[in-house]
């Protein structure tokens, strides 16, 4: 099962893998992500044939555990000029199979195909795994280990309390950057793909003012931990997968992909009703969508932007 480099799709494939029936597993060994194969080559029906020894690679470090690849393959130059997309597919797929798709997704953040070689020294694609190991990287093909790697981020918060949800965020962490970026850019492609498969990505949102009444921020983090604990139980992890959280000027956020959204909302509703938090909502990562109230103000009023629809 290949996510084709799509991290959101990878969450779905891992969930599918873990829930495959015994009957299926008797006949199939389900692996997620293209597996590394030494001396692998790609051959097409119309005569194209390349291996890791046919591709020159230039590796550039972009940040911690983040690299850019530039690839040059003389054998594919005619294809690159006439069918550029196909040439890219062959080279990225070959890289998946030389390196392993999970390490490729984890460490290679930029991939460029060159029409002529660079002047700087290069190495062969077949040597890429060893070159990355020399950088101290672990080339694990375990998709769950990759999905559990979190990235911290900071934002310039909007002071307007009536701005869209999450625009007040100062800092957060996520193991699924595409969902955060998609929401902020009002890009619904990932949401559409999840929706087509019966899954929903979104976040719980609740006010922080009552938690801030005591000095320090520890109470804020303790509350988020308690909410997340509801969904790290066996029952909770069946209905959703946590993907991060954030702290804003006004609200706290807990992010997730839900496999059973109705049960996830029921569990969250029960949690919030047992707390002193005055209100809480669920909102999808579809920015223009309405919100679902999980707990309402004592006077029955709803918070800004709320409605009763998913």
Residue map of PLM features:
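Short, flexible loop/turn elements at secondary-structure junctions
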Residues: 3-5, 32-34, 73-75, 208, ...
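Extended, charge-rich low-complexity interaction segments
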Residues: 52-79, 273-283, 310
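C-terminal structured domains
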Residues: 23-28, 157-310
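Extracellular/secretory-pathway and virion-surface proteins
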Residues: 32, 52-54, 111, 116-152, ...
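Long, hydrophobic alpha/beta structural blocks
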Residues: 60-159, 177, 181-186
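An N-terminal, globular interaction/scaffold subdomain
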Residues: 2-21
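Short, low-order "capping/linker" segments at domain edges
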Residues: 37-58, 292-310
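Long, charge-dense
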Residues: 20-41
